[in-house]
Design a protein with these regions (language model features):
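Hydrophobic alpha-helical transmembrane segments of multi-pass membrane transport proteins
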Residues: 46-53, 57, 85, 105-124, ...
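Membrane-interface interhelical linkers
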Residues: 1-49, 77-106, 119, 150-160, ...
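Hydrophobic/aromatic residues within transmembrane alpha-helices
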Residues: 61, 70, 121, 148-150, ...
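A helix-boundary/kink motif common to multi-pass secondary transporters
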Residues: 66-67, 126-127, 153-154, 215-216, ...
């Protein structure tokens, strides 16, 4: 090799060495991952904010529109949007193992089960009681399921944050003047709301499991929600679709499909890349807070003092999970760096 070429070769070698070191450096890798907008807990909180608009939007539906039909319409259209815009949904089935295909099917069943159980629970117990039972039980179910399946034992931080968030959520929506039911709650309605929380915890945990196994988030959620959208079509058709003929009905269905299903679950899938499912379900307890604030600002409802106190406790619990811990064990940091590297490979 000519002598005058050696400096150029040396410079290239040094550049390649720096690139190789930076790609292996956990600190630099973490910085590159964190540059992505709305990733991790922030993406999940944004999704929860979109979900919080569901109640306000559903009040604008035409009178007589069945609640189950409204929810099924949003899932059917939004689920198909997620499926059609996920380019890797078809290759995903081929890339999955047999056990992972079973997980996809179970996840789709859980997605379809949520509106089928939640909306009847609302009709029996009221919005406040159904919301606090479904969303309050979901983090508990997620933590227990993750523990039972060997995906991580819930830590003290998760337990403290979940306890604060559930208590704050309960004070927020069950304060006097908000629940709307003076008598005892309907037992079947409570059971249906708890089943809705279990459904939500199941498909969150399944989605996180498949993403952690190396599958991209968008195809995973697209496959689950596309199949679930097809599954709830009979519910929509049996409940009646006349309300969709009005502009208000069409606008509500479009909002539920585009914002609270398509966009919200895209953000949720992005957040699941680096957030454990049990923490993600706790973060989604921001949904009733957003729904309550919208009810005050848009619908003119008034909150008692206990609800404002509950809102503060809920915010503190969510902040406990959103703000990174200042001190972590070295092993935890190394596992986080390895997961970040896996996520970068998935999203390329």
């Amino acid at each position: 090799m000519p002598e005058h070429a050696s400096p150029l070769v040396s410079a290239r070698s040094r550049a390649a060495s720096r690139t190789s070191r930076s790609s292996r450096s956990p600190r630099l890798a973490r910085l590159r991952v964190h540059r992505a907008p709305l990733s991790g807990p922030a993406a999940i909180l944004a999704a929860a904010a979109l979900w919080g608009t569901t109640g306000t939007a559903s009040t604008l539906a035409p009178a007589g529109a069945p609640p189950a039909a409204v929810g099924s319409a949003g899932l059917a259209v939004g689920g198909m949007l997620l499926l059609l815009t996920s380019r890797g949904a078809r290759p995903l089935l081929a890339a999955c193992t047999r056990a992972q295909r079973w997980l996809l099917g179970l996840g789709a069943l859980a997605v379809a089960g949520y509106p089928v159980t939640f909306y009847p629970a609302v009709a029996r117990t009221g919005v406040a009681v159904a919301t606090v039972i479904a969303l309050g039980s979901a983090p508990v179910f997620a933590g227990l399921l993750a523990w039972a399946t060997g995906q991580g034992r819930p830590g003290a931080r998760w337990a403290a944050a979940t306890t604060a968030a559930v208590l704050g959520c309960g004070a927020l929506v069950l304060a006097p003047g908000l629940a709307g039911h003076s008598g005892p709650a309907d037992g079947m309605g409570i059971l249906l709301a708890a089943l809705a929380g279990l459904c939500y915890a199941c498909y969150s945990l399944i989605g996180r499991t498949l993403i952690a196994a190396g599958h991209p988030a968008a195809p995973v959620l697209g496959a689950m929600f596309g199949a679930a959208g097809l599954g709830v079509l009979p519910v929509l058709l049996a409940s009646g679709t006349e309300w969709l003929g009005s502009w208000r009905g069409a606008a509500v269905a479009l909002h539920l499909a585009a914002c609270t299903t398509f966009l919200a679950y895209r953000l949720f899938g992005r957040g699941l890349r680096s957030t454990p499912a049990q923490a993600a379900t706790t973060l989604t307890l921001a949904e009733p807070a957003v729904a309550t604030l919208l009810a005050v600002a848009v619908l003119g409802e008034r909150l008692p003092a206990l609800s404002w106190c509950g809102l503060g406790v809920l915010a503190a619990g969510l902040a406990c999970l959103t703000v990174p811990a200042s001190r972590r064990r070295r092993g935890d940091r190394e596992r986080e760096h390895e997961n970040d590297g896996r996520v970068r490979e998935i999203t390329r």
